[in-house]
């Protein structure tokens, strides 16, 4: 389990405010690795980077904080603090569903706000509310691009941020001025992450449970059938541990026809390989993002077709729900729209976008009451009682976050 990241930290904020550049400044790794993204320059699927935080035993704080093995200031070998997985969530408004499913994997978050634009931008607002709704408590604000604004604008931007975070989970968050492009104040940011975003206590003795955020076929077109690798799923363990050779179950699984009806069947397979932080492992635990090789037909896992599933020890996973009753907690205002619109009560018959763990599905409200509602899902979700879910409603051409529900 050594070499594995201990914690997932989300990078959230408006498009082009520098989330991916910040990852690069911290790690030397671009998270925009999917070809379609690099073309559009936007992180579409959740981008991941594992970063090792280290500390020089000789230098004073904050200069002692680094990601380099040899201190650039004094040449001393640095000491390992911990390995962290950064989840780079897309800042484009049409990709809010991906941001919400990523928030399910976050133990803490860094909200990136560019100093050269007025704060808040629409997605800055939407992402902060999403963190609030999903219940991510430990937040740090990075005021980025300070190298391209005047001192006056930097201070004005700081005041705008302070005003904007009032009454949210980031009200007391430290605000760190940074230039991701120049690498300025990255040491202070690492120090702040170490102080503010602690590794949560995890239960490794419970049955393994993993939220699946990606799934793919790693075979090249035209590969020899004898050498084909099985399908791969990627995501984060929230409890327990997985070992090579373990049997796993994946729910809700795949859609099959049974007696002329469409139904869902969970998948069972054996773990053939585990990868975390770019290294092969025999065993993985919670924290960080892991790739799990299986014996599944790669056609079942290609192009993220299993993302949103829950995987783990067979027979221990939450039930697959096609409908549920939820307690509803609505925000006062719709987030992300230009005009401030009041959130109307949920109505019978309306469709809602529902994020359950890493699943995004649409639920139609069968019956709505003052503080709870019954919904029927278009795509089933593997979810337990008491789980928090994000609720969005169609406003104009977009889904907008309106609050959260708790499954009853």
From Swiss-Prot:
EC number: 3.6.5.3
Region ranges (G1): 13-20
Ranges where the record places region G2: 41-45
SUPFAM superfamilies to which the protein is assigned, alphabetical: EF-Tu/eEF-1alpha/eIF2-gamma C-terminal domain (SSF50465), P-loop containing nucleoside triphosphate hydrolases (SSF52540), Translation proteins (SSF50447)
Keyword Zinc attached: yes
Function: eIF-2 functions in the early steps of protein synthesis by forming a ternary complex with GTP and initiator tRNA.
Quaternary context: Heterotrimer composed of an alpha, a beta and a gamma chain.
Name of protein: Translation initiation factor 2 subunit gamma
Organism: Methanothermobacter thermautotrophicus (strain ATCC 29096 / DSM 1053 / JCM 10044 / NBRC 100330 / Delta H)
């Amino acid at each position: 389990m050594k070499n594995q990241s201990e914690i997932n930290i989300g990078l959230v904020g408006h498009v082009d405010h520098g989330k991916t550049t910040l990852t690069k400044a911290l790690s030397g790794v671009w998270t925009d690795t999917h070809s379609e993204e690099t073309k559009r320059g936007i992180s579409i699927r959740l981008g991941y980077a594992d970063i090792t935080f280290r500390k020089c035993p000789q230098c004073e704080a904050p200069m002692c904080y680094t990601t380099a093995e040899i201190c650039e200031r004094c040449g001393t070998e640095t000491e390992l603090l911990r390995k962290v997985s950064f989840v780079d969530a897309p800042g484009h408004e049409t990709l809010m569903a991906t941001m919400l499913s990523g928030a399910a994997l976050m133990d803490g978050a860094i909200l990136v706000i560019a100093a050269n634009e007025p704060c808040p931008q629409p997605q800055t607002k939407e992402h902060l509310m999403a963190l609030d709704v999903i219940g991510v408590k430990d937040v740090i604000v990075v005021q980025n691009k300070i190298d391209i604004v005047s001192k006056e604008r930097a201070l004005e931007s700081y005041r705008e941020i302070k005003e904007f975070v009032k009454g949210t989970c980031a009200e007391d968050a430290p605000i760190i001025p940074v230039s991701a492009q120049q690498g300025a104040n990255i040491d202070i940011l690492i120090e702040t992450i170490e102080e503010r975003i602690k590794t949560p206590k995890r239960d490794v003795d419970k049955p393994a449970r993993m939220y699946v955020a990606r799934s793919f076929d790693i075979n090249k077109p035209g590969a020899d059938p004898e050498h084909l690798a099985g399908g791969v799923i990627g995501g984060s363990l929230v409890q327990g541990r997985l070992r090579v050779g373990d049997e796993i179950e994946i729910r809700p699984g795949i859609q099959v026809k049974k007696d002329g009806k469409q139904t869902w069947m969970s998948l069972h397979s054996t773990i053939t390989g585990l990868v975390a932080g770019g290294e092969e492992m025999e065993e993985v635990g919670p924290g960080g993002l892991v790739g799990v090789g299986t014996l599944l037909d790669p056609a079942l896992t290609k192009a993220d077709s299993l993302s949103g599933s829950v995987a783990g020890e067979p027979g221990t996973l939450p039930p697959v729900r096609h409908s549920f009753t939820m307690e509803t907690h609505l925000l006062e205002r719709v987030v992300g729209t230009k005009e401030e619109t009041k959130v109307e009560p949920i109505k019978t018959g309306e469709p809602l976008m529902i994020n359950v763990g890493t699943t995004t599905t649409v639920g139609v409200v069968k019956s709505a009451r003052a503080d709870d509602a019954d919904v029927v899902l278009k795509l089933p979700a593997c979810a337990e009682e008491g789980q928090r879910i994000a609720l969005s409603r169609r406003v104009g051409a977009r889904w907008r976050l309106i609050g959260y529900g708790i499954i009853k």
